[in-house]
Swiss-Prot record:
NCBIfam families: iron-sulfur cluster assembly accessory protein (TIGR00049). Residues 75-89 have a biased composition (Low complexity). It comes from Saccharomyces cerevisiae (strain ATCC 204508 / S288c). This is Iron-sulfur assembly protein 1. SUPFAM superfamilies: HesB-like domain. Fe cation binds at C178, C242, C244.
Length: 250
């Protein structure tokens, strides 16, 4: 008995073999695998039916145990045909002449403004270099008096100067006494080379230059009582005196 179904399948396979231009070789379990020279004219895709339709549920084939419906989709698109598709060309338009011209004019204006700023800065620097530097005005501060005389001291000094042989009083400071310094008064006729002459109300007094830092700003007074007649000093620079008041320290 001749199996017509199997012979019909072999005829179909032979037609496909001739149409594709490939060759077939035997596979396992009576199947045949097809090999083509880098050409794949069709593909078989296996898609199982997850949810059966209403008509399939009624059919007797679906009710048989152990059998599941299959679905094959044949796609004739190959990799070479997909790769042969050319991509779309991107469109590009060149700028017009007016746009290019306006851009060049804007660049020229910008460069011109930069050149003007540089020239102005250079000219300003040149002018500042040529002008002589201005000298700062010196503020005049009142000079502190080296020594001041009380009215009694002025009266006594005038009496000394009214003598036939006028005498000047020279004030200095010597290292003496308990505290370190003591006032030293001398009668002189002429001031020394480095002495300072102070004049107040027409009365002159000479101060030793070495004693300036010790007695600057002091006030000179004259005391005449039953115990003594002498000149005394009120010195703001004094930090302390001895018990007898003869010496002081600064």
């Amino acid at each position: 008995m001749i199996n017509t179904g199997r012979s019909r399948n072999s005829v179909l396979l032979a037609h496909r073999f001739l149409s594709t231009g490939g060759f077939w070789r035997g596979g396992t379990n009576g199947t045949m695998s097809r090999t083509i020279n880098n050409v794949n004219p069709f593909k078989l895709k296996f898609i199982p039916k997850t949810v059966p339709a209403a008509a399939d549920s009624v059919s007797p084939d679906s009710q048989r145990p152990g059998k599941k419906p299959f679905k094959f989709i044949v796609s004739n698109q190959s990799k070479s045909s997909k790769a042969s598709k050319s991509p779309k060309w991107s469109s590009y338009a060149f700028p017009s002449r007016e746009t290019i011209k306006s851009h060049e004019e804007a660049i020229k204006k910008q460069n011109k403004a930069i050149d003007e700023q540089i020239a102005a800065a250079v000219s300003k620097n040149d002018c500042s270099c040529t002008e002589p530097p201005k000298k700062r005005k010196r503020k005049l501060r009142p000079r502190k008096a080296l020594i001041t005389l009380s009215p009694k001291a002025i009266k006594h000094l005038r009496a000394l100067l009214a003598q036939p042989e006028p005498k000047l009083i020279r004030v200095s400071a010597r290292n003496r006494g308990c505290s370190g310094l003591t006032y030293d008064l001398q009668y002189i006729t002429e001031p020394g080379k480095f002495d300072e002459v102070v004049e107040q109300d027409g009365v002159k007094i000479v101060i030793d230059s070495k004693a300036l830092f010790s007695i600057i700003g002091s006030e000179m007074d004259w005391i005449d009582d039953k115990l003594a007649s002498k000149f005394v000093f009120k010195n703001p620079n004094s930090k302390g005196t001895c018990g007898c008041g003869e010496s002081f320290m600064v």
